[in-house]
C-alpha cells in the first residue's frame, strides 16, 4: 500500500524547502517514509486485539551533518507518515510516533532504521458521550472498551463485560466489534454480530449503557 498522495506531496516539498541540503545525495523522503513503514510492518506484534506496530524509529543517514531545523521538520513529517499508515492499516500503536534522524559516517545514500515499541499517552481519536456523565475517551487504535481497569476505554458498569468491545480505525473507516460480551453490543439499536462500521453521531450500547459516538 503506497503513501497517500497528499502525504507524498508534503514529503516531496521537503526536498525543495529548508531540508533540501539534508537530502542532497541521500534517499528521497518518500523512499525514507516507505522504508520506515516496511520496518514497522516487519516488526508487527499480533495481539489479541490485532496488530500492534512499533512507534519509535531511529534513522541513521550517511553523509554530512544537517541543520537541526531541517532535521526536525523531516522527523515530524516522517512521524505523520507512520501515524497515517497505522490508521489506514488498522495498526495499534503503543504511544506517539517518534522519529529521530542521526547523521553518521558512511555513504550519503545509505539509511539504516531501528524500530522499537515505546509506551506513552496518546490523544483521543474518538469519545463516547453518555447522557449526563463525563465522556469516555478512546485513545489507542484497536481500543478495548470494557469494565476492566486494564481496558483502554473504561466503563464502570455491572452490565458491561470486562473486555466488552473493540473500536478501531482502518481503511478510511471506523469500526466496532463485540468481544464475546455477556450482554452484547448494539449500534443504533441493532446487535453487532461481527464487525460494523461506525460513523460520527451513531448510538453505541455496551450491555446497558448507551453512548453517542463522536470522532475527534
Per-range role (PLM):
Residues 1-3, 7-158, 168:
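Intrinsically disordered, low-complexity acidic Ser/Thr-rich regulatory segments
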Residues 135-208:
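Forkhead-associated
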Residues 210-216:
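Edge beta-strands of extracellular beta-sandwich domains
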Amino acid at each position: 500500500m503506497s503513501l497517500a498522495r497528499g502525504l507524498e506531496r508534503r514529503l516531496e516539498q521537503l526536498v525543495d524547502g529548508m531540508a533540501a541540503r539534508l537530502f542532497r545525495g541521500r534517499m528521497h523522503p518518500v523512499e525514507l517514509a516507505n522504508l520506515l513503514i516496511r520496518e514497522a510492518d516487519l516488526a508487527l506484534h499480533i495481539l489479541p486485539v490485532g496488530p500492534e506496530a512499533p512507534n519509535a524509529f531511529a534513522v541513521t543517514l550517511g553523509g554530512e551533518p544537517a541543520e537541526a531545523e531541517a532535521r526536525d521538520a523531516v522527523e515530524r513529517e516522517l512521524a505523520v507518515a507512520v501515524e497515517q499508515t497505522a490508521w489506514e492499516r488498522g495498526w495499534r500503536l503503543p504511544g506517539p510516533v517518534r522519529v529521530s534522524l542521526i547523521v553518521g559516517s558512511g555513504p550519503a545514500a545509505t539509511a539504516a532504521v531501528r524500530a522499537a515499541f515505546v509506551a506513552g499517552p496518546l490523544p483521543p481519536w474518538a469519545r463516547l458521550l453518555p447522557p449526563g456523565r463525563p465522556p469516555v475517551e478512546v485513545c489507542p487504535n484497536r481500543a478495548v472498551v470494557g469494565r476492566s481497569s486494564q481496558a483502554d476505554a473504561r466503563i464502570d458498569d455491572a452490565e458491561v463485560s470486562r473486555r466488552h468491545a473493540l473500536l478501531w480505525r482502518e481503511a478510511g473507516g471506523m469500526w466496532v466489534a463485540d468481544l464475546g460480551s455477556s450482554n452484547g453490543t448494539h449500534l443504533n439499536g441493532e446487535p453487532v454480530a461481527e464487525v460494523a462500521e461506525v460513523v460520527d453521531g451513531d448510538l453505541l450500547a455496551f450491555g446497558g449503557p448507551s453512548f453517542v459516538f463522536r470522532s475527534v
